[in-house]
Amino acid sequence: MSRLGIMVLTLLLLVFIVTSHQDAGEKQATQRNAINFRWRRSFTRRAATEECEEYCEDEEKTCCGLEDGEPVCATTCLG
């Protein structure tokens, strides 16, 4: 094989390695962002649930969740 052919193959291999490494980094960053989002969402939901339970406890009812940011209290929750 000529030197030009070897140089072209080496260049193609180098381009392939660099692009696959970048793709792996983007996938890892996407996964990390998804995990962070899930954690923040669960933390927010937990805080809202505690507030709802405290609010409904004063009325001696069960917290059924939040609707439009307001706690929904009932003796028994449906669905």
Swiss-Prot record:
Annotated InterPro entries: Conotoxin (IPR004214)
Any GO molecular function: ion channel inhibitor activity
Expression (tissue specificity): Expressed by the venom duct.
Annotated compartments: Secreted
Pfam family, one: Conotoxin
GO cellular component, one term: extracellular region
Propeptide residue span(s): 21-44
Residue ranges that the Swiss-Prot or TrEMBL entry lists as coiled coil: none
Residues carrying Leucine amide: L78
Bridged cysteine pairs (disulfide): C52-C64, C56-C73, C63-C77
N-terminal signal peptide: 1-20
Keyword field: Amidation, Cleavage on pair of basic residues, Disulfide bond, Knottin, Neurotoxin, Secreted, Signal, Toxin
Domain of life: Eukaryota
Record-stated family: Belongs to the conotoxin O3 superfamily.
Domain notes: The presence of a 'disulfide through disulfide knot' structurally defines this protein as a knottin.
Protein name stated in the entry: Conotoxin ArMSGL-0121
Originating species: Conus arenatus (Sand-dusted cone)
